[in-house]
Design a protein with these regions (language model features):
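Glycoside hydrolase catalytic-domain context in secreted enzymes
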Residues: 1-793, 797-813, 821-824
Length: 825
């Protein structure tokens, strides 16, 4: 911080104290409680604006959950981490700050820095890595970037929220060393390196205590030990105890308007259960946030002028390609590598796979944003081949993994009509899809929770195909479904066993009727929902969906068609993907298999076309049992809105695939270090201790499909020299290929016979280098002191472990290029 920055920080602190002095107990308690789904109340008397928060992390959804309010959609966090480039993450953060400012958002509810403990974790795609150091480095870049734009961040979910099953109550049982060395480590690094203005405490418990009430981890570790001075907000609906939460260091209970704070908190102070000073501490943290983001009069915002504009589409495209990981690239008939494709050669490309046309650009749950446009692989390749090469493109579905109904979308034109008990219309609005997601006051003009008795989703559907179309519902309550003017289903959906309050959001779709329709002949559709009485609920919301699934063709027939297309083509590109029902917040995965018949499709195509390139569109690891049978495999994660354009850039060789794996890809699910995420009697034991990710594969001598850090670019690198001290590592390398490229030099430490219980090796540092063909570069990489430390449980402190270490300069965890020996005193 410069002197000028420090002086401004001081002025902000004065403004905060002055504002705090003017507030009475009731107003203070009110400020700590959400006024609605996304904001805190304004307090005009002290010049405080309403602070607005929004998800995060790949875009800024804003306060409305609808495609009517679009946001840029960047690649999934796994893709961002795969770039191994904190500076790039910082640029992503700056773009998101720009989006937040545009939408009047002061605080982004991101980044998610829980770890890839098990590949089953439903929010795996939303977290960065299995490695705490890489997670901390990328997370620091991201936080710095968002805050460079004057917008706050909320590092989440503090801590131990590494899976979704029973997430509201699960007790993550984590021993002190893994807690410190693995799960807390990214949070600690981000607090130290990026000074985040906020943190979100998780739903779960850690070692018996609910995280929103965790005095030790919040007050002692996060605040006293690490010096965190931002605000602490509960995950949505996580705050459950007035006294427990305020004494546990929770500043803000979200969402509102009814929370355990507000009047209940003022009451607890009056009853002598809570000292008023605890309320003051929380208010101070909130006012400090307001001062930083420019929402408190008299306090200079950290960033007063909006930074220079950033081209969102261009950055989204660059980020996507930088995160794509080329895990396999074999030579094909002419002796050259399968990728990049020879754009000048002409010929035919057969593009296959449902996700090539209907791209999966983001993962499900609160990470969902609505981009203004989506470039699918089909869109991206069609225009690139047209503009940049003589090749022709054919497209065939091949296999469709979405066997489940999804919100009515393509071909539907829908609106919502709200009626009162007498049937009179009280409100109306257009709907971008069949999904109704109205939260708080975000209702169609005229409608209110008090007057609405029913909501009809109604309009027309123009079928894209002949045959049996399935219609269905998601949500809880009474429905009537009509197609073509006829009632095809009427019934009530009760709450299932899994009482997740977001059931209507994440719950399984239900098929209700099948109707035979003709391509191009429009038909009327209507789904009427009886509105339950939500007026007494702490959070008023209406969520339900009209679902649809087009005619399903015989899987064998689809594969046979794809095989014909592949046989006739010079190159086959198969896009395989997970679905919304596989990767989402709200539930965990059951296995790592690609859904539907996609594995069969790849095998059948590879059998007839030796130049088969498989593009994997998944946010987390999936099994690739055919990986040795195809010429190339490119992992694209959830690539964000510009994914298809970036894919064309990479396939045609305009851009190098820049990614390295941020997480190990197992050959088969059974090899994953942690294969169970279902708690036993409410407890989830982190029994593997320090051994997650590559640390576990190494300890158990299991060879993964692709190791941590692996990724091929379009050039080769010769590592020439390595010098190591306890502080720095100096590596010299040469680009020996024919193209410019970027290499991620990964530094691992491996202790030699030290008798201390710890992994055989770990990532200590890394750096990206760039060089043209034939050029050499030298990089000096700082080794953080923490890389040599372990947490001493008895002394409750960090202990430096001296002795002999092998220092490795590596292309990946499985590909060490040079080693040096270091004796640490
Ligand atoms: C998620 C948070 C998110 C919040 C608000 C919760 O269900 O766990 O990550 O920020 O909802 O959407």
């Amino acid at each position: 911080m410069t002197d000028a920055d420090q002086a401004r920080e001081q002025i902000r602190e004065y403004a905060v104290e002055a504002a705090l002095d003017k507030l009475d107990l009731d107003t203070k308690a009110r400020l700590l409680s959400g006024q609605d789904m996304w904001s805190l109340p304004a307090i005009p008397e002290i010049g405080l604006k309403s602070l607005v928060m929004s998800d995060g992390p790949i875009g800024v959804r804003g306060v409305r959950w609808t495609a009517d309010d679009p946001s840029i959609a960047l690649p999934s966090p796994t893709g961002l981490a795969a770039a191994w480039d904190p500076e790039l993450a910082r640029r992503a953060g700056r773009l998101l700050a720009q989006e937040a400012r545009r939408k009047g958002v002061h605080v982004l509810l991101a980044p998610t820095v829980n770890l890839h403990r098990s590949p089953l974790g439903g929010r795996h795609f939303e977290c960065y890595s299995e490695d705490p150091y890489l997670t901390g480095a990328v997370g620091s870049g991201y936080v710095n970037g968002v805050q460079d734009g004057g917008v706050g961040t909320t590092v989440k979910h503090f801590v131990g929220n590494d899976a979704e099953t029973e997430r509201f109550t699960v007790d993550s049982v984590i021993a002190p060393r893994p807690l410190r060395e693995v799960y807390l480590a990214p949070f600690e690094a981000i607090v130290a390196n990026a000074h985040p203005w906020g943190i979100m405490t998780a739903y779960n418990r850690v070692n018996g205590t609910t995280m929103t009430e965790h005095q030790y981890l919040v007050n002692e570790v996060l605040r006293a030990e690490w010096g965190f001075d931002g605000y602490n907000v509960s995950d949505w609906m996580a705050a459950r105890s007035t006294t427990g939460d305020i004494l546990g260091g929770l500043d803000v209970a979200m969402p509102g308007p009814q929370t355990v704070y507000g009047p209940a908190l003022a009451e607890a102070v009056r009853a002598g259960e809570v000292p008023e000073s605890a309320v003051d501490t929380a208010v101070r943290n909130v006012l400090r946030l307001a001062a930083r983001v420019g929402a408190l009069e008299g306090a200079p915002a950290v960033v007063e002028e909006a930074p220079a504009p950033i081209d969102g589409q261009a950055l989204a495209r660059e980020l996507a390609a930088r995160g794509f990981v080329l895990v396999r690239n074999e030579a094909v008939a002419d002796g050259s590598a399968a990728l990049p494709l020879d754009a000048a050669a002409g010929g035919t490309v057969a593009l296959l796979g449902a996700a090539a046309r209907d791209a999966r650009v983001l993962g499900g749950g609160s990470a969902v944003v609505f981009p203004e446009r989506i470039v699918s692989p089909l869109d991206g390749l069609t225009s690139a081949l047209r503009d940049r090469s003589g090749a022709s493109l054919t497209y065939t579905i091949g296999a469709d993994p979405s066997e489940e109904l999804t919100p009515a979308d393509k071909g539907f034109e829908l609106r919502a009509v709200c009626r009162d008990a007498s049937g009179a219309v009280v409100g109306e609005g257009t709907l971008p899809s069949g999904q109704v997601q109205w939260i708080g006051d975000d209702l169609p003009a005229g409608a209110s929770y008090e007057t609405m008795a029913s909501i009809e989703v109604t309009g027309t559907f123009l079928p894209r195909e002949n045959g049996e179309h399935a219609f269905g519902t998601r949500g809880l309550g009474a429905f009537t479904l009509a197609v073509g003017g006829e009632t095809v289903w009427e019934g009530v959906q009760e709450m299932g066993n899994e009482a997740d309050p977001f059931e209507a959001f994440f719950g399984a779709p239900s098929e209700r009727a099948r109707v035979t329709l003709t391509e191009g002949e429009p038909v009327e559709v209507s789904l009427t929902f009886q509105v339950p009485d939500v007026t007494a609920l702490p959070l008023k919301a209406i969520m339900f969906s009209l679902l649809h699934l087009g005619p399903q063709r015989e899987a064998d027939e689809l594969i046979a068609e794809a095989v014909e297309a592949a046989r006739a083509a010079d190159t086959a590109i198969v896009v395989v993907a997970t679905t919304e029902r596989v990767e989402s917040e709200g539930f965990d995965r059951k296995d790592l298999a690609l859904p539907g018949r996609q594995d069969d499709l790849v095998r059948a195509v590879a059998a007839v076309n030796p130049h088969t390139v498989v593009v994997v569109n998944a946010g987390s690891p999936v099994e690739l049992p055919w990986r040795d049978e195809v010429a190339a495999v490119l992992l694209t994660w959830f690539p964000g809105q510009e994914g298809g354009a970036a894919l064309a850039d990479v396939l045609l060789g305009d851009t190098e695939p820049g990614g390295r794996l941020p997480t190990t890809w197992p050959a088969r699910f059974a090899d994953a270090p942690v294969t169970e995420v279902v708690p036993t009697e409410g407890r989830l034991e982190y029994g593997e201790g320090l051994f997650i990710g590559y640390r576990a594969y190494e300890a158990r001598s299991i060879r993964p499909a692709f190791p941590f850090g692996h990724g091929l670019g379009y050039t080769d690198w010769a590592y020439e020299s390595l010098e190591a001290t306890a502080e720095t590592v100096r590596v010299r390398l040469t680009n020996t290929g024919a193209r410019p490229g970027r290499e991620v030099v990964q530094v691992y430490l491996a202790p030699v016979d030290d008798g201390v219980e710890r992994p055989a090796s770990w990532l200590a540092a890394f750096a990206g280098v760039e060089a043209g063909p034939g050029e050499s570069v030298e990089t000096e990489i700082a080794l953080p002191a923490r890389a040599f430390e372990i947490w001493d449980e008895e002394a409750r402190g960090w202990q430096r472990i001296g002795g002999t270490y092998e220092v490795r300069a590596s292309h990946s965890h499985g590909d060490t290029r040079l080693t040096a020996t270091l004796d640490l005193a």
